[in-house]
Amino acid sequence: MFCYQCQETAKGTGCTLKGVCGKAATTSAAMDLLLAVSRGVGIVSDALNRAGAAKDEKEIGHFLCDALFCTITNANFDDADILQRVEKGITLRNRLVKLADENGVTLPERAELRWDGSKASYAEEAKRQGVLRIANEDIRSLKELTIYGLKGMAAYYEHASNLQQEDLTLIHFMAEALAIVADPEADQATLIDLVLRTGQAGVKAMALLDKANTSAYGSPVITKVNLGVGSNPGILIS
């Protein structure tokens, strides 16, 4: 395994045996597969978007947000649950590939589209799809920075969506960003621009979540509360 997505990572360079957070190597491998499948879905979805082809936007958005959110630190360490998402993603990716073929949409040659998703190949495919698959450290860092931005954006979007607030332009951006991350020819200039655009999209997602929360619960106001100690059990809300 190799993971350096949080500031607590081992020696400040990356966890390679087990995560400081407690994440097992098998869980890290499952997450690498899920991210690879997400890139595959993103590649095809982005190509369909550019061609103006109709598709199930809600299903794509739900999968991408759920998959990316699932891989943030301490969100989900259940290997079987993560691998179920991998299977779901493979099914969605294959369906989108078929849709692209039916609409005459040409897809790029990418490793994320070649893997057949067979369970017997999980372990080997995870090794090929990890963070270190990218040799150039600068390119790797820019792509990973984008991915971490997308993960945060996915979390905001999923919470907003649960409160009936959605914005398909953000889902389209996720697909585009994943497609660029999957492109082995993407250069530093392209990726620096992508990082900045990811930040802009993240702010837009935060605004969407704020709208969702205030629409559902109202705007926060200064309120007096009891700071005393009670006799019954309570819940601390920060």
Task: Mark where each language-model region is.
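Metallocofactor- and cofactor-centric catalytic cores in central/energy metabolism, strongly enriched
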Residues: 1-238
